[in-house]
Amino acid sequence: MSPFLGGWLFFCMLLPFSPGVQGAQEYPHVTPEQIHLSYLGEPGTMTVTWTTWAPARSEVQFGSQLSGPLPFRAHGTARAFVDGGVLRRKLYIHRVTLRKLQPGAQYVYRCGSSQGWSRRFRFTALKNGVHWSPRLAVFGDMGADNPKALPRLRRDTQQGMFDAVLHVGDFAYNMDQDNARVGDRFMRLIEPVAASLPYMTCPGNHEQRYNFSNYKARFSMPGDNEGLWYSWDLGPAHIISFSTEVYFFLHYGRHLIEKQFRWLENDLQKANKNRVARPWIITMGHRPMYCSNADLDDCTRHESRVRKGLHGKLFGLEDLFHKYGVDLEFWAHEHSYERLWPIYNYQVFNGSLESPYTNPRGPVHIITGSAGCEELLTPFVRKPRPWSAVRVKEYGYTRMHILNGTHMHIQQVSDDQDGKIVDDVWVVRPLLGRMMYH
């Protein structure tokens, strides 16, 4: 073998281990990426979260001009996150909260430090008070592969169609996969949406690895429960996010079931005391109480854990949500869309034959888990259940417009049919007597 050939082979053997070859995301740097917004519940604020690959200052510069100077500054903190995979990859998660924002005003911002800045993004500060009409995109189960709803969500976001996003669990498939590189890729994919709108979340079963560590580290939600459960107010609505996963991954602590349940009851009591101002109570949790899909998931069982609790009697949520008059319950997990008739304990409680969702006598359940992932869509059983109103086995997402304290408009958008509205329903409830279902 010639010296030249031997040297060339040695170089080729070293090449895969060269930091420059493995890609920019592996080489330590401080240019922000994976930028996303969230709302921590304090009026006039917005929180910016991003990732770098080396320590750096956490600063956001913001203003009102797209190309002009950004006169305002806000500073925050960064925390190292070490993924639980074998490579123990380290990310630096930065959080900065912008304050004293003018309600409804549009802002331009960039984040980073003198060592590296992001490009500029735009967002609209949430309006204060109860007398406005929030518009939300709602979906679950969106992966880094096959995220069918994402292109339309990007376009709708750019057109100013939404004030916030509710992602009802299951991200990336999975954020911990490939030593958390799949999580990185997913967070980059959603950036065109999440850097412009508060991207509000709840955990799903695909987040459970290493005790939900990627979920807890990457997102910034209200409260002090690491985003597992929290609530916030938006216009005439009180929105509650919670973890159905505490009922299934018991090795992370059975005490979490009771802890969350007590928190939920306390939060619902407070929400009902404020119900004149904010009549709507909306929940979001990943695994449904009911579903008519052709699989063996918990929601196909008559005594599902989320509905009835452990052993069919401990800390079930259906009785709790019914007791405090929850209006609307969003779920995902099933890779399909299903709207139920107003329901309690397997009985349909329509408002009337002609207008089932006008003054319904039970909560309305909507399963919206068809945003798109590698696991494809979930089929339904052939014959619809008597409590199932609409079933759609197509990729898409849900739009919710909370018009005022009495009227709410819900639509399902089909990506398979190029944005066609495949479900359209108004939920109407009177201002008075909201807590009790009669």
From Swiss-Prot:
It is found in: Secreted. Pfam families: Metallophos (PF00149), Metallophos_C (PF14008), Pur_ac_phosph_N (PF16656). Binds 1 Fe cation per subunit. Its cofactor is Fe cation; Zn(2+). Its EC number is 3.1.3.2. It is an enzyme of class 3 (hydrolase). GO terms for cellular component: extracellular region. Glycans are attached at residues 211, 350, 404. Zn(2+) binds at residues 170, 205, 286, 333. The lineage of its organism: Eukaryota, Metazoa, Chordata, Craniata, Vertebrata. InterPro entries: Calcineurin-like_PHP_ApaH, Metallo-depent_PP-like, MPP_PAP, Purple_acid_Pase-like_N, Purple_acid_Pase_N, Purple_acid_PPase_C_dom. This is Acid phosphatase type 7. It catalyses: a phosphate monoester + H2O = an alcohol + phosphate. Residues 1-23 form the signal peptide. GO terms for molecular function: acid phosphatase activity; metal ion binding. Keywords: Glycoprotein, Hydrolase, Iron, Metal-binding, Secreted, Signal, Zinc. Belongs to the metallophosphoesterase superfamily. Purple acid phosphatase family. It comes from Mus musculus. The keyword Signal applies. Disulfide bonds: none annotated. Fe cation binds at residues 141, 170, 173, 335.
